[in-house]
Amino acid sequence: MSLPSRQTAIIVNPPPPEYINTKKNGRLTNQLQYLQKVVLKDLWKHSFSWPFQRPVDAVKLKLPDYYTIIKNPMDLNTIKKRLENKYYVKASECIEDFNTMFSNCYLYNKPGDDIVLMAQALEKLFVQKLSQMPQEEQVVGGKERIKKGTQQNIAVFSAKEKSSPNATEKVFKQQAIPSVFPKTSVSPLNVAQGASVNSSSQSVAQVTKGVKRKADTTTPATSVVKASSEFSPTFTEKSVTLPPIKENMPKNVLPDSQQQYNVVKSVKVTEQLRHCSEILKEMLAKKHFSYAWPFYNPVDVNALGLHNYYDIVKNPMDLGTIKEKMDNQEYKDAYKFAADVRLMFMNCYKYNPPDHEVVTMARMLQDVFETHFSKIPVEPVESMPLCYIKTDITETTGRENTNEASSEGNSSGDSEDERVQRLAKLQEQLKAVHQQLQVLSQVPFRKLNKKKEKSKKEKKKEKVNNSNENPRKMCEQMRLKEKSKRNQPKKRKQQYIGQKSEDEDNAKPMNYDEKRQLSLNINKLPGDKLGRVVHIIQSREPSLSNSNPDEIEIDFETLKASTLRELEKYVSACLRKRPLKPPAKKIMMSKEELHSQKKQELEKRLLDVNNQLNSRKRQTKSEKTQPSKAVGSVSRLSESSSSSSSSSESESSSSDLSSSDSSGSESEMFPKFTEVKPNDSPSKENVKKMKNECILPEGRIGITQIECSVQDKTSANTTLVHQTTPSHVMPPNHHQLAFNYQELEHLQTVKNISPLQILPPSGDSEQLSNGITVMHPSGDNATTMLESECQAPVQKDIKIKNADSWKSLGKSVKPSGVMKSSDELFNQFRKAAIEKEVKARTQELIRKHLEQNTKEPKVSQENQRDLGNGLTVESFSNKIQNKCSGEEQKEHQQSLEAQDKSKLWLLKDRNLAREKEQERRRREAMAGTIDMTLQSDIMTMFENNFD
């Protein structure tokens, strides 16, 4: 025989659970009917119920250890048969069978199994349907069933077997008349222990508690209805623990103690406890079922396998127990109710880890509880609770019933009298404590009021003293007052309660126009200021203190005058602080006006400089007619160099002033051409050194050095400062470059510095289309050729005509900030190419200078020969002018071509910058918009790849 066959032979299924009540004490109640027709029917139709519709077949499923682990098997078919055959006495027994079925599944299977998930789904449906079950259990057709002979046997059986209410009955509160037995824990172990305790021990426990009487709580109806039946003490002792379903008896036939208990229940409870019962109903509502269901029942330690639960949690609590206490009026005030609810949540937090699912559910349910509990109104302390008056009423009525009941009532009454006396003393102590607290709370406010009066007196004294003090002290006191105003909000929080009544009395009521203006001002406030408005209203209006701060409706007719005045102060203060931006605009406008004034002053200075240059030009023309000697020419050269340096200084100073208002963009755009400072003008010592070092050729007048100060594009005023320096002397601090005229013209086409025209030296001034003329006196050039050893720098004058037209042109063409940035980027890009071009030109210059130095002795000999022949200076200068006339025409044509090229370069640069700006704007516009079709295409591609 194989091993599986042996195992199948060993596995034996036990007989199914019984479903016929052999004791024939089963009943049919409204709750049992609901369980049969609604709960069981819905569970049976559920798609996950098929594993639970029949008893577990251990042989077929090959589960040899199932019935060794599960001692009390249960299934839906057995429950269905028991309901059909009236097996159950009350609904709590049927509910216990359902819970047993689910706990067996959780006990045998692992937590992650499919069968466990199916059981959890069924249990959720079961609890949901169970919450809709009628709360009061009533027997259906009970009067026909109950007979005279069997009533006594039912009472004896119930006294022996069911001495305490069932745990599940405590959870769902299905009793019409609350139980009067001593409170037991909800665990099934205590149920078994309670069954072993006899009725006499229960009576002793009830007497010691002294709350309710034992004698005839469950006396059968026949003992009251029939006059012939005898009343025996032994019978009453056995009939103590009859199940608490009493609906089959009329109310006028019930024993006295039960009628007295109904009177006690009808007494009015406090307003706080009513709110607590509403909170409990809210927590048990359907909308909170998804996260409140673990707290409906006590923790089933055996089913969940939590063997160390009671070692960690000493005081278990659940919503079912809290509801039972609330129904039995065990809560004397709302704080005891809140203590039990919070104990339930603390037990959950204590036993479970913080990241557990039950902890998150507990936090959600606790948020619901705390939000509702915070809205309970506060009530004053009463002299005597109603519950103790109720017990006295039950005593006096109970003493008149029987002798035995009166004796037991006396013993319980004595204990109750002692308790009432103790409670009265405790209440007196509480009153004394409350009075002390009120006195202590009023003392600091009195002190604060005294401090206020003192501070007012001190302020008056300070005002009198301040009239005789210096203005500096007055300023210091003003600063101190401002600091005190800043610190006032902290003091207001402390003095608010004491000043509240005074503010309400002194506040002036608002009329309709003021209220309307206040509402308009509140609507003008920004969103961050509205929170303070809500805080002011809630702090001053008790009726709105519990309202939601996110959404609040304000009715100005219901608000107090003090609240409205406080709102008016706050709103006016906020609106005063807001209009700070218009003055800034005024300041900006004033800056622009100053900027324009500076420009006008600089233009006037430029015109003055031009006038001075014209006067000097006339002086130089008059000097041409006088004959000059070699020595005199040298002295005259030194004077002209000094005058040129002074004129260059004046021009450079004017250019510095004109460029001071610019934003410094010239240093970034054109780093090779910077402003000329006064310190850079050639001194006499430098001129002497230059005489000893270099000699220029005959046809060459001088190599000019250009210095451009390019202003900001908003000013659009450009000036050129031409200064003659030796060819090889180039100060590195300002990156000055020396070129001949042809090379400068070619460089201008590359750099596109300005539309100014640089002309070759000539005696006459040629006016260009741009309105700028460059003057080159010929007389000075003739005198310079008399020196054979060296060549001194020659002055060149600049005259700017039509300055107003240039100003209007600069103002009319104002590129935007975006164009400016693009031009800067493009110029930086051109920087490398320009530097290469400059290096090449400097190398060519050096090479040409070397060639010219070899020709210089020949030129000096020719000059001496001409002087020996008796030629005058004027004839010599005429020769030079005739030689240079052809070259000037060529250079003029080249300059015009260079200007055309520069215009083409400018047009190209502008078009390129415009295209870049359009592209940038298009990208910004595309970045701001969302292409929904592209997004949908991306999502479809993602879904296809995901599948």
Curated annotation (Swiss-Prot):
Cited PROSITE patterns: BROMODOMAIN_1 (PS00633), BROMODOMAIN_2 (PS50014), NET (PS51525)
Gene3D superfamilies: 1.20.1270.220, Bromodomain-like
NET domain sequence ranges: 500-582
Ranges of compositional bias, category Basic residues: 447-462, 482-494
Bromo domain: residues covered: 27-133, 267-376
PTM section of the record: Ubiquitinated in a SPOP-dependent manner, leading to proteasomal degradation.
Ranges in coiled-coil conformation: 417-470
Localization per Swiss-Prot or TrEMBL: Nucleus
Low complexity bias locations: 403-413, 631-668
PANTHER family: BROMODOMAIN TESTIS-SPECIFIC PROTEIN, FALZ-RELATED BROMODOMAIN-CONTAINING PROTEINS
UniProt subunit comment: Interacts with SMARCE1. Interacts with mRNA splicing machinery proteins SRSF2, DDX5, HNRNPK and TARDBP. Interacts with the acetylated N-terminus of histone H1, H2, H3 and H4. Interacts with P-TEFb components CDK9 and CCNT1/cyclin-T1.
Comment field on protein domains: Bromo domains mediate interaction with histones that have acetylated lysine residues at specific positions. Bromo domain 1 mediates binding with histone H4 acetylated at 'Lys-5' and 'Lys-8' (H4K5ac and H4K8ac, respectively). The bromo domains also recognize and bind a subset of butyrylated histones: able to bind histone H4 butyrylated at 'Lys-8' (H4K8ac), while it is not able to bind H4 butyrylated at 'Lys-5' (H4K5ac).
Record protein name field: Bromodomain testis-specific protein
Provenance organism: Macaca fascicularis
